[in-house]
């Protein structure tokens, strides 16, 4: 039997303390009724004896201690899931936000997900084509991987996210491909951009959007990514779809976590973030992957903005420990007008070797990737040397490497946000650029591939 309590004794920020409770569980959903009759939702954060601390999703403004009632519903926060969610836009709490009808759920699922037995996981191995050369060619995304994008304030990560959502697909697969997009604490303008972009290109038909705006209560940001991942798990493991989850901006999620931690008067960790930030982030990132015996998969691209462009900040630092690589956006490349401004040298996909090669992309992929990395790195060093000592100090080979580095940035990395390159086009473009270098410098490519794929001189 559900009990209703009128014993609210304290309200601090987004938190509320209810006394005299019995049989209340951690993470239990709470219905809060204000003295005005307005209803809000919350969840139990902590139970200590007969006291329960409740996190209020819609914020605590207007709550009167005497007139407020709390009803503990005996179940966690749930999302009603259905295949009809495709093509729809929801708010950060999973309510329809596009003037469409309510979803008739096939079932209701706890948004915290279930623990996955590590032995049930299957290893990521299939290539996902994003249409972005700097990712496909050099930092390949693999089905079931979690590959974050480290951006910074003012960089075009929103445009890159929209481009990937629009273009991504699994090659050589008959399975349906779906996008689940979670916007966490973004501005109204960004939300409008994403919705317009998805609708303009038709990507909305295979997508589910969860939009938590900057003007929404910060506490909702804790629920939004979990709503998105719950929807993704349903589509992947019960409907057999290949699901790509894009979450932006994880920094806003961590800020909301810090706000709750401060309200609970917890001992702060690095830079004021709670000591359990790593554990909490892992509850999001580890929901990516593949399961044995299941056709579907969940691939994650979380996007975060590094405060003060600092890679050692706790959010990117801890994210890097949990995920399988990172795509780093560069302010220097952005200032040069290179779009997307992906800095390929510090970027990394730890699973790229598992998703490339014969039968997946092309047999020469690994060799050309290694050679492009090496030549670009040498070319950048040659350009730095030229800036200090002058171009006359460079050898002929160094001059060619410096020119290669410029061409690589201008033609390979820079492609704009509307160009969708196939993996064949990306690999062929790499060969075209490598032709600028003397054959003696192409030490990382096998001779048979040089003979087979190197463009011939025009007759």
Curated annotation (Swiss-Prot):
One GO biological process term: proton motive force-driven plasma membrane ATP synthesis
**Entries under Pfam families matching the protein:** ATP-synt_ab, ATP-synt_ab_N, ATP-synt_VA_C
- Keywords assigned by UniProt, alphabetized: ATP synthesis, Hydrogen ion transport, Ion transport, Transport
The highest taxon in the source lineage is Bacteria
Looking up CDD domains in the UniProt record yields: ATP-synt_V_A-type_beta_C (cd18112), ATP-synt_V_A-type_beta_N (cd18118), V_A-ATPase_B (cd01135)
Q: Which GO terms describe its molecular function?
A: ATP binding; proton-transporting ATP synthase activity, rotational mechanism
Transport as UniProt keyword: yes
Under the heading NCBIfam families, the entry gives: PRK04196.1
What does the sequence similarity comment in the record state about its family? Belongs to the ATPase alpha/beta chains family.
* Entry protein name: V-type ATP synthase beta chain
